[in-house]
Amino acid sequence: ADDVLAGIRAIKDEQEIALMRASASIVDTVLAEVAPRVVAGITEIELASEVDLRMRQHGSLGASFDTRVWGMGPALTRDASVRVSTDALAEGTGVSFDFGAITRGYCSDFGRTVHIGEPSAEYVTVHEVVMAAQEAARQAAVPGATSGQVHEAARRVIDEAGYGDGFRHRVGHCIGLDVHEEPFLSAEDTTPLQPGMLFTIEPSIFLPGRVGVRVEDVFLLTETGAVNINATDHELKAND
């Protein structure tokens, strides 16, 4: 019964898609407002709190999961599993955001990285690799392709660039009334994708003490391929 219900929930109707777009619009707006505050001296928890407040101000019923903000770079050697702290952020740090809104029960899930100061050559390179991995996964996400094939498309780009050790998770998941719904875009998942599914594509590269970059958008699968319902650009944002 659970499998049948998951299959029904995976395909969204037009009303559900409209609510998902509204939820995506909230997180786009919030990042645009919060990104300029990513400067040396601010703490991760301050940024996370600002995200949560602004999501509610823009109509979200709350966060679709605990908001995560964490820095990575030469000044921070901790592992990426620590997703928010009271640490003050320093110049030379890339600050990754992972958060989602809720619109009438329907969730969004979103991520970007904002750099404090001029990014190093490696940061720029890793950012380009992560964006290329997301695009490869998007192109692989066509009706009839399996969830695993989408994951492997992103994995291939990152492995070939030499950063495979820094990509430690599945590339995405379906999303709707729950922020994490089946099928999951993981190596072992053979579920065929169908039009009407909405799912995240969220590759990342995290190398403690060096660099951390993530991107996450929600995509709608149509008859001709995957369409990003988020509007935020994919440039590496750098604040002075």
Question: What are these regions, as identified by a protein language model?
Answer:
Residues 1-240:
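Active-site neighborhoods and metal-handling regions in enzymes and metal-associated proteins
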